[in-house]
C-alpha cells in the first residue's frame, strides 16, 4: 500500500491498488459503490466493517483539500463527494478516496486533518456534513440513472462509466436521498465534522 506512517504498516488494504480500481471521473458515488462490491466479492474483510460516506451540506458547497482536481494548497469546492470508510478491527480506521492526492488508503486521522482541516476556520455555509451508510445497505439501496450528469441539451458533462446504470427493484434514481443531509431522508446516519471525527477517529477506536 502507499506509505502512511507506522500505524498503517501491517494493514492490508481492502481494495486493489488505486490504478486498478473501477474509476470514472466525477462519478464518485459509483466508484465507491464498485469498491463496496469488490470488498463484498473478495471477502478479505467483513462487509459490515465498511461504510460509504457522502459529504455535502444544505448548500451543496463543500471544500475538500488534497484533491487531484486542485493541485496545490487550495481546496476543491464540490457539491458532494463520496469516500469509503473502513472501520478496521486493527484499531485504526482508513479512508479510501479515489480522487485524493493523499495515500490510498489513508489513515482516518491523517485524511481528516489534511482533507477536511477544521470547521473553525470555515464560514458556516461551507461546513461539511457526513452521511454514513453501511456498505451492504449502500449496495442494496443505491440507484442512479446518471441524469444529474447531463446538461439541459442532454449531453454528458463527463463521460459516463462503461457499465450499465446501477438500479434496484424499487428505484432507478435516488442519488439525492444520499446527498441530502436531512437525517429524516434516506439511509444511514448524518454527522457534523466534529461528530464524525469523534465517532471514527483513533481516540475512540
Curated annotation (Swiss-Prot):
It is found in: Cytoplasm, Cytosol; Nucleus. Mediates the side-chain deamidation of N-terminal glutamine residues to glutamate, an important step in N-end rule pathway of protein degradation. Conversion of the resulting N-terminal glutamine to glutamate renders the protein susceptible to arginylation, polyubiquitination and degradation as specified by the N-end rule. Does not act on substrates with internal or C-terminal glutamine and does not act on non-glutamine residues in any position. Does not deaminate acetylated N-terminal glutamine. GO terms for molecular function: protein-N-terminal asparagine amidohydrolase activity; protein-N-terminal glutamine amidohydrolase activity. This is Protein N-terminal glutamine amidohydrolase. Its main location: cytoplasm. It comes from the Eukaryota. The active site is at 28, 81, 97. It catalyses: N-terminal L-glutaminyl-[protein] + H2O = N-terminal L-glutamyl-[protein] + NH4(+). The keyword Ligase does not apply. The keyword Nucleus applies. The gene is NTAQ1. Keywords: Cytoplasm, Hydrolase, Nucleus. The lineage of its organism: Eukaryota, Metazoa, Chordata, Craniata, Vertebrata. It is an enzyme of class 3 (hydrolase). GO terms for cellular component: cytosol; nucleus. InterPro entries: N_Gln_amidohydro_ab_roll_sf, NTAQ1, Prot_N_Gln_amidohydro_ab_roll. Belongs to the NTAQ1 family.
Amino acid at each position: 500500500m502507499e506509505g502512511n506512517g507506522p500505524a498503517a504498516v501491517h494493514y492490508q488494504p481492502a481494495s486493489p491498488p488505486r490504478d486498478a480500481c473501477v474509476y470514472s471521473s466525477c462519478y464518485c458515488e459509483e466508484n465507491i459503490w464498485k469498491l463496496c462490491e469488490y470488498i463484498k466479492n473478495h471477502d478479505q474483510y467483513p462487509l459490515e466493517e465498511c461504510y460509504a460516506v457522502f459529504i455535502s451540506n444544505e448548500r451543496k458547497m463543500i471544500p475538500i483539500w488534497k484533491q487531484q482536481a486542485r493541485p496545490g494548497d487550495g481546496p476543491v469546492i464540490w457539491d458532494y463527494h463520496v469516500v469509503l470508510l473502513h472501520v478496521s478491527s486493527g484499531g485504526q480506521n482508513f479512508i479510501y478516496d479515489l480522487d485524493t492526492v493523499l495515500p490510498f488508503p489513508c489513515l482516518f486521522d491523517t485524511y481528516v486533518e489534511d482533507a477536511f482541516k477544521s470547521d473553525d476556520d470555515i464560514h458556516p455555509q461551507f461546513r461539511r456534513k457526513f452521511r454514513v451508510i453501511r456498505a451492504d445497505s449502500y449496495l442494496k439501496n443505491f440507484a442512479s440513472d446518471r441524469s444529474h450528469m447531463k446538461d439541459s441539451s442532454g449531453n454528458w458533462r463527463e463521460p459516463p462509466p462503461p457499465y450499465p446504470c446501477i438500479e434496484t427493484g424499487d428505484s432507478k434514481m435516488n442519488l439525492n436521498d444520499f446527498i441530502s443531509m436531512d437525517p429524516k431522508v434516506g439511509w444511514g446516519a448524518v454527522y457534523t465534522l466534529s461528530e464524525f471525527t469523534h465517532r471514527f477517529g483513533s481516540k475512540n477506536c
